[in-house]
Amino acid sequence: MRVALLTREYPPEVYGGAGVHVEYLARELAALEDVTVHCWGGDRQSAEGGPEVVAHRPWNALAGSAPHRAALETVSVDLAMAAAVEGAELVHSHTWYANLGGHLAKLLYDIPHVATVHSLEPLRPWKAEQLGGGYALSSFCERTGLENADAIVAVSNESRQDILASYPAIEPERIMVIHNGIDTAEYRPDPGTDVLASYGVDPDRPSVVFVGRITRQKGVTHLLDAALEIDPEAQLVLCAGAPDTPEIAAEIAGKVERIRAERGNVIWLEQMLPKTEVIQLPSHATVFVCPSIYEPLGIVNLEAMACEAAVVATRTGGIPEVVDDGVTGVLVPFEPP
């Protein structure tokens, strides 16, 4: 079967869990079927034995200013992807960035469209801060793609319920739950400390570690608001980059500056690190923190637990389906009881 995977993220341009998911899904599917990945960005080299990779860039002829232009660029890539997948027998889209492309391919070529839901636009109202009026367009792309998909994959049972609540037109039997997974041959404790040393992290001192994008969804602002409650001897290590907007980037920078002035011991790695480097952070963490306010699954917790880190995470979304409270981690209600 010729399968077309549509995604915004694909290595080396990965900034979130959806990109991690698609990387491994494409690798494993390519061993079984004829798979082509259609993604955003610069040209990629197709790995030997792996899927063919075709990259698409937004149309540079689009006019307009940020933030709504970003949503228009997404539609331009969706159109390009839909045109490029001719000959596929099944199209599989990931996130709102590709859902419309999957739907258009379904209509054009009369092929099944499968959509994996990694998050839902109705449950991320803060996206209006990032996209402005483009948030209405991103919501339209997602709704159109999902309501007309032949099958939908939810990454947790809680996410399945969220899909049904957000889009009542979707019949329950169209949704199946397949939890995200990770490659434990890659994510395992790394005894090395060279990466830590290069970023100024002392492996012999306790550390509280956060890894994630700078976005309202990941709750990093709430972690920083609680930072003064952390033992001042502990290092607060933030591996946090790819801010949604300049405004939230400035907000985080201001909070970090104030915390440093009061307690010190804050190490902020402002770039998204490669996977091989990130693994050392949870491998040596005293506590790995996931303060998300919305998380359909939270693949970062799987990665941390595979590195034998103790996880403290919010009890939200699909997190309780992978973090066993009191066994593999501690779950904390987002709102005070």
Identify the meaning behind each predicted range.
Residues 93-98, 117:
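Short His-centered aromatic/hydrophobic patch
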Residues 111-114, 122-144, 161:
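Nucleotide-sugar donor phosphate/pyrophosphate-binding loop at the beta->alpha transition
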Residues 158, 181:
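Carbohydrate-associated surface elements
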Residues 240, 249-272, 276:
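Nucleotide-activated donor-binding/catalytic signature segment of Leloir-type glycosyltransferases, i.e.
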Residues 287, 310-313, 323, 331:
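Short hydrophobic beta-strand element within catalytic cores of glycosyltransferases
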Residues 293:
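Aromatic "clamp/platform" in nucleotide-sugar-dependent glycosyltransferases that forms part
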